[in-house]
Amino acid sequence: MGGLHQGHARLIATAVTSCGGKGSVLVSTFVNPLQFGVDEDFDCYPRTFEDDCALAEQAGASALWCPDERQVYPYGTSEGWRLQAPARLTAHLCGPWRSGHFDGVVTVVMRLLGLVRPHQLWLGEKDWQQLTILRHLVNDFGLRVRVRGCPTVREGDGLAASSRNRYLGDAQRTVASAFSSALCATARDVCAGSVDEASAQVALRQQLREAGLEVEYVETVDPVTLQPARPGRSIRLLAAAVRCGETRLIDHVFIMTRSPIVAIDGPAGAGKSTVTRAFAERMGLLYLDTGAMYRAVTWWVQSNGADPSSAPAVEALLEGLEVDLSPLKDGVQTVRVNGRDITDAIRDPEVTGSVSLVAAHPCVRALLTKQQQRLGERGGLVAEGRDIGTAVFPDADVKVFLTATPEERARRRAKDLEARGHAVPDLAALEAQIVERDRLDSTREVAPLVQADDATELITDGMSIEAVIDALEDLFRFRVAKEIWPTPQG
């Protein structure tokens, strides 16, 4: 837009850091007429070109682009192409109060992306509804750009940084400062369980009015769908819009009742362990390798000479069995059974060949599911397996079904076996083994391999490991803002 402030400075600096000196950061300042209604502040919206140039340069921007209206809309705003944001994403929060606003946003951003063709699009989390709509835009149109978010920057009195803050006089500023503090206090009360959500919203409205603010809306919505939040969701968005005099202000907080849980399911050989381990390290999550736990039980059954297909024989070996997973260290997680390190042993082809048989026994699944759910009580983890999103953590915040074609998985399996020093069958034999294991996993009676209804399918054929991890991070950030789960530094 324009009227750059410290929130924009943080956004620019973060984008510069993400480039690592290998790219350029272009800052666009265009006051888009399509985003303003008839009685809104288009004519008086801050246009501070000299100050914007100085701020962008100091923050590390490579260039500042300040197009005029004809450059962006060569046929005029009434004759050119216009997009319409989906009604489901604009039915709540700012949508009903700013008719056509988000249509103007998606139209100008699509135009910007077409002209610039960036690799990344950096936006502030302050306007979460706008950020979410643009993430949907990029996903739905299959655009080759990553949408990245930057946490809300707050000024000294707690007010979210905004170009419109300069409209406020000293007295109004004092009144407006009650906005963010009231939101934060309400979120704390809801998280603590001292008040139910509906009552909290009523009380918040009253508190804002008593502070001298005119309330437009106070709503709690799902961060991804922007629809009223389903009871029991661990992460919800509490958002509000008020007017302080003639100045319209928006703000939000997240209500998070436990740390995030990510469930990654998929067939054997899809690369789940490799990418989930790296994703956990990137996002600061505990890595729960449930597949390794089933492999550990399989190894235990084989080492005791029991028949993996016999449920009574397997169940007899489970009493007192302890499977331990250590935290990741330099990308490696140690697996122990009753204190013995079997990290390498569980990757033996003999274990691989029997793990589906052992995992199909209800007694094994009951034991390990209970252990896994106990680890997940506080959240803050990512788990991968076959039934994480359907059986182990059905309330996971993010669910992904990671897969690849049997041909691709056979090639990956061959490389893994070769790297570990094992004999490598021909690709046709490996592919046949993979297809058979898929059949066993998907047809077993207890917790079969199926994609959860609310999971996102990610097909990884042709993708590098880094690209898959980026895709997982983007799915995570769709729901989990940096302001509530910052990306670890270093």
From Swiss-Prot:
Catalytic activity: (R)-pantoate + beta-alanine + ATP = (R)-pantothenate + AMP + diphosphate + H(+); CMP + ATP = CDP + ADP; dCMP + ATP = dCDP + ADP
Chief location of this protein within or outside the cell: cytoplasm
Active-site residues, as the UniProt record annotates them: H8 (proton donor)
List of residues binding ATP: 1-8, 124-127, 153, 161-164
Keywords: ATP-binding, Cytoplasm, Kinase, Ligase, Multifunctional enzyme, Nucleotide-binding, Pantothenate biosynthesis, Transferase
Annotated residues for binding of beta-alanine: Q35
Residues that hold (R)-pantoate according to the record: Q35, Q130
Ranges where the record places region Cytidylate kinase: 254-490
GO biological process: nucleobase-containing small molecule interconversion; pantothenate biosynthetic process; pyrimidine nucleotide metabolic process
Localisation: Cytoplasm
Record keyword Kinase present: yes
A Pfam family assignment: Cytidylate_kin
Protein name: Bifunctional pantoate ligase/cytidylate kinase
Lineage: Bacteria, Bacillati, Cyanobacteriota, Cyanophyceae, Synechococcales
Recorded name of the encoding gene: panC/cmk
